[in-house]
Amino acid sequence: MNKEIFNSKLFEKLDKDNLIENSREWSNEIDSTWNYNDVVGILKSWESLNTISLEYIDSIVNCLTETGKDILINGSPEAKLYNILTEQGMSPADANKQFGATAFGSAKNKGWIEVKAGKIFKKVESINDIVKSDLSIPDLSKLDSKTLEQYKKSRFIEEKKLSYYRVTKGEQYNKRSKELSDLTIEMLKDDSWEKESFKVNINAMGVVPEQGYRHPLNKVKNEFKQIFLDMGFEEMPTFNFVENGFWNFDALFQPQQHPARELQDTFFIKDPKTSHDFSDEYCERVKQVHSVGGYGSLGWIYDWKLEEAEKNILRTHTTAVSARMLYKLAQNGFKPKKYFSIDRVFRNETLDATHLAEFHQVEGVIADVDISLGHLIGVISEFFKRLGIDNVRFKPAFNPYTEPSMEIFGYHPILKRWVELGNSGIFRPELLLPMGIPENVRVAAWGLSLERPTMIKYGLDNIRAIFGNSINVNFIKNNPICMFESK
């Protein structure tokens, strides 16, 4: 549309009548090809300058349906049936197939057609298509109420909600001037810009700046962290992705010939290949309990090797951090503690819908006098209850460093099966006593996956959709807020 012509017509109308009662009807009268959205855009630009005032009005109007528009062009169904008839006639079946039974009945009732020898023929020389005439009037609401209702039932006419503006003169109407689109150097030099009006709408929304987006896992991680803090836990430092085999395996009473310590399950560091950050006295006690036993245990009965314990690896679990914290706790004089950590761990696993080589582990440790497996089940159940996940199941299991041990499962509504969330249990005396932990102290611990509860909450069936190098960036930008409702 031509903006100059529009503005000319707009101000010509307001100068003459002081108002435009219906912006939609007025613009259609001026030029029916104008897009009404463009019309509204120009009106609002003048409103922003207080040149005009707009009053928004909703109205219910009667409009032609697609069927009604077809009648306006091609005639009513009964008229089309009449016009197609020839001297050879047409069978009622063909008529019904092409135009419907209603057209045949209506044409017959109006006396336009008749049936002879099983065929339809014209009964009159000419017809007056009243339906087409009725639908052609500009204001359909002027039809008598009975006819209007009949056409609505026939779905020729429908009611629509149409909005328009009542336009009147604004405070700055008489001060309007031609808007300039460019600010020139000359205007700045002679201050003439102060007298001009520019095409700038300071109330218009600017472009939303691109910004960083928090990863869904970080959102869930923060919720997990807050739940732990609310339950009285203290966060452990987990900044060491690289551990040696001593803290990751040996201190946890995991034998050196265990399959988890093989190349197919663990990532070994090439350089530096080894490290030694543990005391010789503690190392000797760990070696003793592995090799020949102690503290009421037979041990694993094998030749324990220091060089195996010194090998650097990418930690396979954050329980290595728990081992360091418990050892430190024992050296400084034991006090009951509740620790937690949430960080990355690494496993040389086969990738599938629920397994990654790099993922996050949620670790919890409770150290106190005479606690039991029942305490552990209660704490884990309460933790998941606060996450809003009630469908949790425990299953007896074996772990080298806990006895008794349990696997934790959660039901995945998308996969429609139970998904393993983590492991738990009571730390063995062979792990705790060499550290110097008192004999009457029990330590309950568990390791949970961060990704899998997140998958359940976000309704995902593939772990690679939420973490890893193949994640869709748009998922990070556009994912909805997913809150874990405390219960």
UniProtKB/Swiss-Prot annotation:
EC number: 6.1.1.20
Positions annotated to bind Mg(2+): E403
One of the record's GO molecular function terms: phenylalanine-tRNA ligase activity
Cofactor(s) the protein requires to work: Mg(2+)
SUPFAM superfamilies: Class II aaRS and biotin synthetases (SSF55681)
Compartments (UniProt record): Cytoplasm
The keyword ATP-binding belongs to this UniProt entry's keyword annotation: yes
Subunit structure, interactors included: Tetramer of two alpha and two beta subunits.
Xref: PANTHER family: PHENYLALANINE--TRNA LIGASE ALPHA SUBUNIT (PTHR11538:SF40), PHENYLALANYL-TRNA SYNTHETASE (PTHR11538)
Designated name of the protein: Phenylalanine--tRNA ligase alpha subunit
Organism: Dictyostelium discoideum
